[in-house]
Regions:
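Active-site gating/metal-coordination segments in enzymes
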Residues: 34, 47-132
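Active-site gating loops and adjacent loop-to-helix segments of metal-dependent hydrolytic enzymes
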Residues: 7-11, 19, 30-37, 63, ...
Length: 254
C-alpha cells in the first residue's frame, strides 16, 4: 500500500520535528507501507515551484521507496516543460494547489494541466487543506479546496485521474454525488480527515460511495501516521474486509 500524502521539508507556520526523508522511510516501515508519494512542503507557499522541485528530487534520490510528487503550476511559463521533466525524473504524481494560486473552479490553466496529466497517465493530486481552520495561521490565507474545483477537473476528460487528499465527509459527498458514475470513477480520496467512531463517517462512506474510491494517505509530518490505520481498524466488523485502492495502480505510465 502506498501513502499518497506525505511531505518532506519545513512548514512555514509551525515547527515540525524531523521532516526528513530518512525519518519518513522509517515511519513507512513501521506502518507497513510499501512507499509514498512525497511532496516538498515549503513549495506550497512559494510563487515559483521550481527550486522546491529541485530540492525534492535531490532529497529523495537515495530512497527508492519515496516517489517524488512535484508541483506543476499551469499559469507559469513553460509549465509543459516542467511536467515533462518531472515525469522523466520519475514523478509518481503531479501536485497542484489552485486555492493557493488564486484559481477558480473553472480556471482554464488547471483544466489544461489535468488534460496533460491524463494524456500521459499520471494522477493529478489535489490537497483540500493542511490544517483545520481553528489552528490555521492567519498568515495562511488560502481557503479549502472546493467541490466545484474537483468536479470541473473530473469532467475535463475520461483520461483524467484525480487523487484528493484532506477532504472531510461533507466535501467528498458534495463532489461525488454531483458527478456521473463515469466521472466518479476518475476521483480517489484519502481518509485521513474523515471521522471514525463515534460519528462513523468513514463507515458510512464505505457503504455509500464504496471502499474502492479510497486510497491511503497519512499527511506526515503534519498529522499522526496512526490515524488512518486506526480508522480502518475501528470499522464495523462487516466492513473490515473491504478493500481500498492501492494508489500504485492508478497510473498507467511506467
Amino acid at each position: 500500500m502506498i501513502d499518497v500524502a506525505a511531505y518532506v521539508g519545513s512548514y512555514p507556520f509551525r515547527h515540525l520535528p524531523h521532516p526528513d526523508p530518512d525519518v519518513l522511510v522509517r515511519v513507512l516501515e513501521r506502518e507497513g507501507l510499501a512507499g509514498a508519494w512525497v511532496g516538498y512542503l515549503p513549495s506550497v507557499w512559494q510563487r515559483d515551484p521550481a527550486p522546491g522541485n529541485t530540492a525534492l528530487f535531490a532529497a529523495l534520490e537515495p530512497y527508492p521507496t519515496l516517489r517524488p510528487a512535484p508541483i506543476v503550476r499551469p499559469d507559469w511559463p513553460r509549465w509543459e516543460h516542467t511536467l515533462e521533466e518531472a515525469l522523466d525524473r520519475g514523478a509518481a504524481a503531479i501536485r497542484a494547489y489552485p486555492m493557493h494560486w488564486g484559481m477558480g473552479p473553472y480556471d482554464p490553466s488547471m483544466r489544461e494541466l489535468a488534460l496533460a496529466c491524463g494524456a500521459v497517465g499520471v494522477p493529478l493530486l489535489l490537497t483540500t487543506r493542511f490544517e483545520d481552520l481553528r489552528q490555521r495561521s492567519p498568515l495562511d490565507v488560502a481557503s479549502d479546496l472546493t467541490a466545484a474545483h474537483v468536479r470541473a477537473l473530473a469532467r475535463a476528460d475520461a483520461s483524467v485521474r484525480l487523487v484528493v487528499t484532506g477532504a472531510g465527509r461533507e466535501m467528498l459527498e458534495e463532489t461525488h454525488w454531483g458527478l456521473t458514475p463515469a466521472e466518479q470513477g476518475r476521483v480517489h480520496w484519502d481518509f485521513a480527515w474523515i471521522w471514525g467512531p463515534p460519528e462513523d463517517h468513514l463507515a458510512h462512506l464505505f457503504r455509500t460511495v464504496g471502499a474502492e474510491r479510497f486510497v491511503y494517505g497519512t499527511h506526515w509530518p503534519l498529522r499522526l501516521t496512526q490515524n488512518p490505520r486506526a480508522n480502518l481498524d475501528l470499522l464495523p466488523a462487516e466492513l473490515r474486509d473491504a478493500s481500498i485502492t492501492d494508489a500504485s495502480t492508478l497510473a498507467f505510465r511506467r
